[in-house]
């Protein structure tokens, strides 16, 4: 049933495949590299795969889209836009320098590179191929990524001891005296906190931006790359399945198997 549907609706299946590929592209396009900065320090964000002087680079900030422009590098000239929110500088090496950062600097920064240099053709980039890279900057007092703290519950151990004592006098009347002594021992261990240690973070961030790492946990950049790899693998699998169904390979194999088994030739309904 599925084979017949795909055979009779090839165009719809192809459109659906194109939509899936476009959605995956948008997801990968909007994925940003996490970067952390400490209040009062400078943070440098680097453009990637730039070959001066023909390549052009644009820096902007803001969530989604083109955002607000900061710098434009065109050949040997640099254009800097006035901005009252940030104190920044456009460096000659196509990098963006954020000066004396505060929590207000915590936002998304994007760089778009127009690869016009002929050397990019070696990598099959083609003409006017653009490479977009974005950084998700987080600024705090420690200059480290937020860590989680777990608190163990307090345990109390109670121990009770009972002692019985009998006293007898010289009279004929015997008096039994029972004394109960209770001793209670309380054990109150101090609560333990498991806090992941802070790691040093390099503020000069490029394409190989390194995020703060915690013990037994992958870094945010590794998680970022792993997510990209999974999306690419999913797209490749979907494309392979669509190609197999588009050329009716399962149906042809089924007819070939019927011919070898029964010695008859079956004509598919799509060829009638």
Swiss-Prot record:
Residue positions with a glycan: 42, 93, 100, 142
Keyword Cytoplasm in record: no
Location(s) in or outside the cell: Host cell membrane; Host endoplasmic reticulum
Stored SUPFAM superfamilies: Immunoglobulin (SSF48726)
Cytoplasmic compartment segments: 246-272
First and last residue of the signal peptide: 1-31
Function: Plays a role in the modulation of host immune response by modulating T-cell function. Interacts with host PTPRC/CD45 and thereby reduces host TCR signaling and T-cell proliferation.
Protein name: Protein UL11
Organism annotation: Human cytomegalovirus (strain Merlin)
Gene designation per UniProt: UL11
